[in-house]
Amino acid sequence: AQAIGKGGALPWRLPEDLALFRRVTSGRPVIMGRKTWESLPPRFRPLPGRRNIVLSRNPNFAADGAEAVRSLAEATEAASRDEQAWIIGGAAVYAEALDVVDVLVVTDVDVDVEGADAFAPSIGGSWRKAAGLPERGWLASGRLNYRVSVYFQPGVNADDVVRAVAGRGPSRI
C-alpha cells in the first residue's frame, strides 16, 4: 500500500503536487477527516478559496472556518449543491469514499516511507484508468519521482478532470 502519512503529515514535499491540488480543488468543496484538518498548517485553515467540510465523530468538534459534520454521508449531502467536491483525506475517509466517488486523482510517489502510519486504500474492482501523467515512467521533482493517474467508474466521463490534471483544462473543473 502507498504511504500517505507519517506522524500527522505528508511524508514528502512535492510542490508540483500541491500546485495540482490547488488547481483542481479551487472553488470546490473539500471534504476531509479531522486528522487531515489538524495536519494543515494553521495559516491554511481553512483552505482558501474552497468550502472546507470536516468529518469528526466527536459531536463537540468545531473547526473554525469550516463546516463540521459527523459522517461521509452528511459531508456529501452538504456538498451536493455543488457540481463537484473533492475528498482530500485522510486514509480512513479515502477508504470509505471509494464506494461513493466516481473519479479519483492519485499521485504515486516512488519512495519507501519508514515509519509510515497512514496508507492509501487499494484501487480495485470496477475502477478504470483514464490517463497518467506521464503516460509512462515518472516525473521528477528534486530527488523524488512521482506520477499522477486519473481513475473513473464505468459510465463516468472523466475528460474534464484529465484535462485539468494535465494542465490543459479549466482551473475549475
Model regions: which residues?
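Enzymes that bind and transform nitrogen-containing heteroaromatic metabolites
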Residues: 1-173
